[in-house]
UniProtKB/Swiss-Prot annotation:
Ranges annotated as biased composition (Polar residues): 590-619
Protein name: Autophagy-related protein 11
Pfam families reported for this sequence: ATG11 (PF10377), ATG17_like (PF04108)
Gene of this entry: ATG11
Native source species: Pyricularia oryzae (strain 70-15 / ATCC MYA-4617 / FGSC 8958) (Rice blast fungus)
Biased composition (Low complexity): 1292-1311, 1337-1350
Compartments (UniProt record): Preautophagosomal structure membrane; Vacuole membrane
Protein family per UniProt: Belongs to the ATG11 family.
Amino acid sequence: MATQVLIAHSGQRLQIDTSRLTTLDEFRSAVSRSTSIPQNCIIALVPPGKALRPQAIQMEKEIFVYDSRMTQTGAPGSPFPVKLEIDLPKPYAITNPPNDIIDTRSLESWQDLFRERRVWAHRLSEDCEGMEKEAHDQYEAMDNMLSCLDAAVANLESVVRATENKYEDLKKWAATEQTGYNDLVTRWEQNLGLARSIPISAAMVRLMTGKDVTGAKGRPSKQATLEDLVDLDCARKEGRRAPTVLRKFNARIADLEKAEGRLMQNFEELEAEFRRVISRSVMGHSQDATQLLQDIQALAGKVENDYRTTMDYSTSTRDLLQASKIAQTHTEKHLPSLHKRALEMDGMLRYAIKARNALALEQAEFMRSIADVSKLDMQVKSLINAIAEDEELATFDYLRLIHQVPYMYAAFTAEAIRRKEWFDKVKTDSTTLANEMALFQDEEAKRRRKWYKTIGDTSYGPESLSTDNNVPGLEVNLLGEDELWPSTSRKDLEEFLDLLQRQRADASIIGDVGKIIAELSNPTKQQFKRLKAFKNGSVHDSALGRSGLMIRGDDELLRSLQDDKTKLETKLRTAESRVRRLEDLLHRQGQASRPTLGNLFQNPSQQLPERSGSAQSVGSPGPIGDRRQSDEVGNQLVQRVAQLEKELQEEKERNAALERDAADRTTHTNDIKAQMDDVNATKKDLLENMEAQKREFLVERKALDEEIRNLKARLEETEDEFHNIDESREHEKTSYDEKVQLLEAQLESLTKEKSDDALKAQGQVDFLRNETRLQRESNEALQAQIQASQDELGLLNKKLKTTNEAADVQLRALRELYTTFVKSAGIPEDVNDLADTVLNNAAETLAKVQNLDADISIMRSNLALAQDVAKDLRAQQANALEKLAKEETTSMHLREQCDEHKAKVNALEGELADGRKQLDELRTQIAQGETGSESLRTRLEEEEKKIVRLTEDLASKQSQVGSLEEELRLFQERLQDSQSKLTTLTLRTETRNERTKDISQRLYSQNERLVRLLERLGFSVSRENGVMTIQKIPRAERSTMNLAASSTADAKSRIASEPADVELLYWMNATDVQGETEKYDKFMSTLGSFDVDAFADTVYRRVKDVEHIARKLQRDVRGYREKTHALHKDAHDKIAFRNFKEGDLALFLPTRNQTNGAWAAFNIGFPHYFLREQEHHRLSNREWLVARITRVQEKVVDLSKSLDTTESINGTSGGAEDDNDNPFDLSDGLRWYLIDAQEDKPGAPSTPGLGKTTVASTKVEAKGDMQTQPRSTPGGLAVLGGAKPSAVDGASKSLSKSLESRRSSTSSTRRPLPFAGALSRNAPGSETNSLRAVATTAPGDGAGSPSGPTSPKPHLAHGEDQDVRLAALPEPQQQRVEVRNDSGGGAIDSLLGPT
């Protein structure tokens, strides 16, 4: 099974197979291969916080690994050698969910929309799943970090606690030692004086010190004292040193206390900080991402299920409406919720990464703190070891020896006494043994001689039998006499104790000497065994010792044995007296219960008459005549007495037998009791012995357990010390390596300085070369500055690119905001959609404003940074130009010097040539033998020296010229490179100026657009003294501002294009730095200033107002929806007369044109709705039809088609009529509608009779008059009973217009009413009303007495070929139609609805 290896600083979890790893180096190598930690920097711990051991590598399940580089202490805030933080991911960019549809009436378009949304939701779910996994990994890394940190703190705690225990032990020892040392320092002279005043035996002094204190001829020169046992010089020396050593010791103890206090304080602070880190842990949020992912997957699954559901839909209108509702639910709830939860998941991921980075930094700081505490712990341990191993404390040992001299003398004296007594006992016992063996030998010899005499002289046996005197004997010799110790006695030791008491020595010394004297009387081990031989109720032979020697002649032992014997005899007598008292008590109890002899065999009833009879015979004197009778009675009495005596004798024998039996039983009982007492006593002794052994075993076991724990603790401490020693060695090795590197660097620097000094010591050429080298270094520094400038330019370009991207993002956001608020495609008809749209737009506006605020601040900071960098570059450019000018001047001087040197060289060459010519001439003259040879030779030598000098000068000048030419060439190359770099920098500066100009223009345009946005939202913006003020415009003034919007925009554009503003926009084109700064400040205070905080607050308040309005509208919409549902429910059974659509209930009546079978829907203002005839309608037998519309087709009459096509279309039936756009012979260009309808309640009678009804809830009474009746209006019905014309007459007139007038009117097109259009989605058929015709019981009810507003009778009619024909009953005179509303309201209002 692989071992889990946790990396502390990164939270990484590795799985390493440790089955083949046997050493720590192999484990470190395996970890180093899997991580970036060097092998020598790996520290391994196991979960209890202990160091990893080689023998436990294969058995550990988890191992914590730390990087020792993280423990290297540095300055606060200094960077760590390892990168701890991980970069935050880019913000998760979510595309808007698909919301575009091509055709709302096409099912395929809806399915495509659902498919795109499903793909979008699936992709979003996968992204969220990845983010959730990454967040889970971060939380797991934090858990691993906390586990490693816990193990490190536990390890530190074990080390610190062990050090604390050592410190406590040392503190206890030091407390007593300090007191003892103080006493020794203050009383050593007093102790020495005491020793001087106490006499001792000179022989003991000789034995203990080897010095002879006696004088010549064996006479003592002085009395030996305890002072002779002490080296006085050494004592005085140590006594003088003792105060200094004591001060040092106290100072070390104080330093140790301070160090230990700092150690414990730092450790407690570290432990408290660790507890705070644990309490602040974010691990409680580790499951939030998982729960959020489950919600996201549930929503994505809902979108998936809805997509599959829509794939099963047909092309029916009902399915289209259902698909539209599902899409609307997605748009309002599911997709925004997915979008919001995805952003929450991204936020959770970023939160987890930030928490992980913060924990990594805290963990690294903890490791540094742990390293500091460990170093302090090592300091405390070193102080403890230094105190414990201090060699100067030997001073106090010698002073303590002075204090303990009486005890040492008493100990040696007691030892001498023991040895003398032991030797005397050995001699006595050996002599006694030899004497006893001699007696045994003599007795054996006598027995043999006597035996030989008894058997007589026989021939049996060996020949030497008669003279056999060789009896085995025993010879005792003492070997190896002990060294000669002085002869002392107990009396001498007791006198020494008395002397100490008189001298008022230390009480502890007196007590120790008294203990020594008392221990002299203690028996030996064998003697103690004999004394304790009686154990557990019996005497054990093994407890008597191996021999009977070494106890004879011991008076003390005999006295102790006699005391034990006396005690045992006393116990025996006490037990015997107790037994006698018990026997006496038992005997008395037996006598009290025994019967008397007189009444032994008689009952009391028998004894009383006899006694009374005898009394009467004795007391009453009988007559003489009665003597015979009395004699007979007397004989009987004699016989009776004899018989009673005989029975008495038998009873005595029987009683004696019973007494003997009782005595035997009593004896037996006593024996049994005695045995029971012995058994109980034995048992008691055994139990006590076992209890004693148990207590001894428990004490011994506790002692052994304590010793085992101490040994284990010492073992762990030793291992920790070994581990710390290894770490300290590694740290020391690292520090030594650093010191070696530092020394090497210093050595190299010294070597370089030495070489520089040697180079400086050269001549002029070397000096010029050094100058050239310095100039070259300056050029290299300039090149480095240019390279740094290029790097800064690259960074600035990156920042500029980032700024441009941010500006583009802001521009796009502003355009979208402008499009959303100003150029909207249209206002939604539903109030819910309107409220949701306003809320969404407001939320998006606020979010974009906040992003824009951050981007503007970043852009401003980047702009300021770019300005600073541009200034620095200009300064660097000026410095570079100055350096180039200086270099050109230097090069010109060098050229001049080079020319001068060349001229000098030419002159020297000319002089050299002249000298050579003169030399040649002189040589020729000498050769010719001219006079004056000596002067010529002198001249020749001078000329030769001059030539040599000129030659040397020429060589030096040539070398100088060569070096100068080389330097000139290098300067020219440097100059060319600097000029090219200067050109590049100039181009980049110009490019940066252009980009800065672009940024300024964009900043200005963005500020202007934000101002326009505020004005669009109904606010006015004003600036005074650099402060922007936003005020809300009253609603009354907004209309005038909207009317003047275009003119205001033109004015603003003109104002923005003023020369002053243009000049401020191009502030970077200023000629000098001061002018540029002034223009920039003016630009930032006027055009570039925009209070984003005020803008955000204004938009926020506006959003809150919109939310308040939206909530109010939602409450209104909720009420309207309830009313709509109620109206829809109420209108479901009412007949519609306008806005015909699918699901409405319509009344169809036959038109005048009966040839084509045209049936039209009864309507007001909505003509040309014709019924498609079906077989089940049975229209031939009907006068009217109430049916529910299932389909409405819009058609336009086109008479331009051929006649053949028209006839073929008219000749078809059913589906062929769908292609004929004029089946009812309508006018050309007329828009009409073909309706498919199903009868609402099939089975109604085709021709209802009088008093009958076709609809259960409708009562109709009609009377027709076939005679010609005058009409009040053309095309209308006569009003019966002389009633006044009602408001329906006007409707009848308008419906009876000619075809041409209707075609020219606007009523032939379908235009939705405003109110109906607003509620058409949620309340279909809301404007339909019920049409109910109530039959009257009398003909004159409705004609003669109209009841209020319900009495008027309308004349129902419609346009050309669609005049209404009421179904008439067979009454010949007239027909009368009365329409009433069951609810009691106006009949015409219920029929027509709100107008």
